Amino acid sequence: MIRIIFLGPPGSGKGTQAHLIANKYNIPNISTGTMLRQALTRSTHKSYELHKNIMHTGDLVNDEFMVQLISTRINQNDCRNGFLLDGFPRTILQAKSMKQCKIFVNYIIEFFASDSVIIDRIAGRRIHVGSGRTYHIKFNPPRNYGLDDITGEILTTRKDDHEEAIRKRLSNYYQHTEPVLDYYREESKYKKMKYFSVDGNRDISKIYKELINIISS
C-alpha cells in the first residue's frame, strides 16, 4: 500500500508530479486545493463563502474545516489501497490531527524551489477545474492551446494566481508549513515513514524519475 504526502510551496512542482505519480501507481490524487475549489463552487453556505474569500487572498483555511474535508475523503473506498495527499497537512495541528485520526503514510516528500521560479511558474499556470490537472503556458503546455488534454474543456486561471496573493501564500507556507516539515523529519527517525527532499527547480521528467526511484527503493 502506497500512502504519500507531497509538501512544498505553491509552484514547487508537487501538483504536476502528484498527477503523474497517482497515475503511475493507480492511487487517488487528493489535492486539498482542488477539493476546496470544487466544494466552494458547489456550495452557497455562508461558511463556504467565507473560506472562498480566504483562499482568494492567499490566507489559510482553518484547521478543523480542512481535517474534516480530508478525513471524509480518505475514508472512501478508492483509498483502501493507498492515496497521495497533495498539500496536506499545512499546519502542525493538521499533522497531529491526522495521527489522532489514524491516518498514516509511508512517504513524506518535500518539494523546494526558489521564490523567483515559483512566481514565474504560477503566473503562467492553467488549471482544469474538474480534475485538478495543471498546465503551464511555457513549461508544460496542453496539446491544444487553452484546452485540457483529456476532456478538451477550457482551462482556467485561478483567482489567487496573481503576484500579491502568491507572495501571501509563500509567506503563509514559510510560517505555517515549514514547521510541519520539521515535525515529519522527527517522526521519520522512528522508521514508521520515510522522508525525502526533492529539488523542484528542475525539469518535470528529472523530478519524476527521482520520485519513481524513491518510491521503488
Curated annotation (Swiss-Prot):
Gene name tied to this protein: adk
Taxonomic lineage: Bacteria, Pseudomonadati, Pseudomonadota, Gammaproteobacteria, Enterobacterales
Alphabetized Pfam families for the sequence: ADK, ADK_lid
Keywords, comma-separated and alphabetical: ATP-binding, Cytoplasm, Kinase, Nucleotide biosynthesis, Nucleotide-binding, Transferase
Binding site for AMP: T32, R37, D59, L60, V61, G87, F88, P89, R90, Q94, R158, R169
Gene3D superfamilies reported for this sequence: P-loop containing nucleotide triphosphate hydrolases
Cellular component terms per the entry's GO annotation: cytoplasm
Compartment list: Cytoplasm
Source domain of life: Bacteria
Protein name from the UniProt record: Adenylate kinase
Domain remarks in the Swiss-Prot or TrEMBL record: Consists of three domains, a large central CORE domain and two small peripheral domains, NMPbind and LID, which undergo movements during catalysis. The LID domain closes over the site of phosphoryl transfer upon ATP binding. Assembling and dissambling the active center during each catalytic cycle provides an effective means to prevent ATP hydrolysis.
Oligomeric and partner information: Monomer.
Stated role: Catalyzes the reversible transfer of the terminal phosphate group between ATP and AMP. Plays an important role in cellular energy homeostasis and in adenine nucleotide metabolism.
Gene Ontology biological process: AMP salvage
